[in-house]
């Protein structure tokens, strides 16, 4: 009887470990796929518009506006800044204020070949809609001359939240995301943590 009980206990522990490992691998793959999709949108905007058209060209503004329209389910807004943080172009729902002190701006300036994921920002309080502030260093054309700057894309968090929310309901584990300064980007129990 004791041997049988030990066998069952060992079996259940092993199955739990295997299931947790499988869930972790699926979660990692789903998040990786979503990040690849986001990065692809960001790189497409950069290489096919920002780097291709002079910002003084009316096609530049039209193409960026169309990019937002065609991705309206995922993109809240776009903006382009010079390396001093001065706004060069922004979509209608963003402000033209200087951004040189924002963490997403300095991260993009300091990490030239990296797409930087900044903190969440609430954009629709009534619907509790949030965006990730995603940025990257870019080269743009202004009056025929190549310049350096930062591209900001505000991307709705819904797709990543949906992936992570699935794991909130598991019996034995949950997942959370942190930014590079150890602030929560996502935690399934953030409301409970915030309220103490």
Residue locations for each model-derived region?
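A charged amphipathic helix-loop-strand protein-protein interaction module that recurs
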Residues: 104, 192-196
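Stable alpha-helical elements in mature extracytoplasmic
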Residues: 27, 38, 60, 104, ...
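Sec/Tat-exported extracytoplasmic proteins
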Residues: 31, 46-49, 68-72, 168
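Juxtamembrane extracytoplasmic/periplasmic/luminal helical "stalk" adjacent to the first N-terminal
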Residues: 1-54
